[in-house]
Amino acid sequence: MNNHANQRFHVGVYGILFHEKKVLLIKKSRGAYKGMFDLPGGGIEFGEKTEEALKREFIEETGIILDSQSFIGYNEYFCNYLNESGESRELHHLGLYYKVSAVFDKVKHGPDGHDSLGAEFIDIEKLDEMKISQIALPMIKKLLKD
């Protein structure tokens, strides 16, 4: 029998923002992707539309206000990881992905107080060398091919 207390199903919304041959990523401070780069975004609150959640998460994690969003698809990922207490957890992660654009002059580089250590633009030529979450990288590469 499964121990459901150790299982988590998470639906999140994420944005892919390109700027000068770079993509905006955040460094994760906790959870299944701790220590990895990931796309800005996160959970959808009850009653919140996906586009509203994405705008809110982008501001929280990067300080950037989005001006356009275009849905590009979804991705699923299943993994096991250790939580902050060292306990084994199972994650079923469903991500909804948008290509986004924004007018901005700076990016929030510091922690957001939740699960991000800060945001930065990463050169798209270096993506394969970086430790990027397994749910995000395929969607970034898909968009680069299109």
Set out the residue ranges of the language-model regions.
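Acidic, metal-coordinating catalytic segment for phosphate/diphosphate chemistry
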Residues: 1-16, 20, 88
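Short connector loops at helix/strand junctions that flank enzyme active sites
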Residues: 10, 18, 34, 39, ...
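Conserved hydrophobic "DFG−1" position in protein kinase catalytic cores
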Residues: 17-18, 25, 100
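Conserved Nudix-box catalytic region and its N-terminal flanking loop in Nudix hydrolases
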Residues: 22-61
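Short aromatic/basic micro-patch
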Residues: 38, 65, 121
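A short coil-to-beta-strand element that immediately follows conserved catalytic motifs
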Residues: 65-74
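Active-site-adjacent beta-strand/loop module that shapes the phosphate/pyrophosphate-binding cleft
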Residues: 75-107
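NUDIX/MutT-family hydrolases
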Residues: 99-101, 109-140
